[in-house]
UniProtKB/Swiss-Prot annotation:
The gene is MT-ND4L. It catalyses: a ubiquinone + NADH + 5 H(+)(in) = a ubiquinol + NAD(+) + 4 H(+)(out). The chain crosses the membrane at residues 2-22, 29-49, 61-81. One of its GO terms (cellular component) is mitochondrial inner membrane. It is a multi-pass membrane protein. Gene3D superfamilies: 1.10.287.3510. It comes from Microcebus sambiranensis. GO terms for biological process: ATP synthesis coupled electron transport. This is NADH-ubiquinone oxidoreductase chain 4L. The keyword Ubl conjugation does not apply. The keyword Translocase applies.
Length: 98
């Protein structure tokens, strides 16, 4: 079990590093964010199953619901930005730029 949790924590760290490195494009940021949410889901499910917290088994499902909402809003924002500007740069979202 410890090797599995280390691998999942490493996957979260790699997704976070990808989010920090490739933050200029919206599509890569959304993919890294989904990787982070998936690793958080798997880690929370493993912790709940190993510690036998049967009353809190709704937590991973709730995390999946929020991840699905985040993905839908992110993809809608990506389509809107790419239709308006033709690019998926995050800097296009700043309306205060000249």
């Amino acid at each position: 079990m410890p090797s599995i949790s280390i691998n999942i924590n490493l996957a979260f760290a790699v997704a976070l590093l990808g989010m920090l490195m490739f933050r200029s494009h919206m599509m890569s940021s959304l993919l890294c964010l989904e990787g982070m949410m998936l690793s958080m889901f798997i880690l929370s499910t493993l912790i709940i199953l190993n510690l036998q917290f049967t009353m809190s088994f709704i937590m991973p499902i709730l995390l999946l619901v929020f991840a699905a909402c985040e993905a839908a809003i992110g993809l809608a924002l990506l389509v809107m930005v790419s239709n308006n500007y033709g690019l998926d740069y995050i800097q296009n979202l700043n309306l205060l730029q000249c």
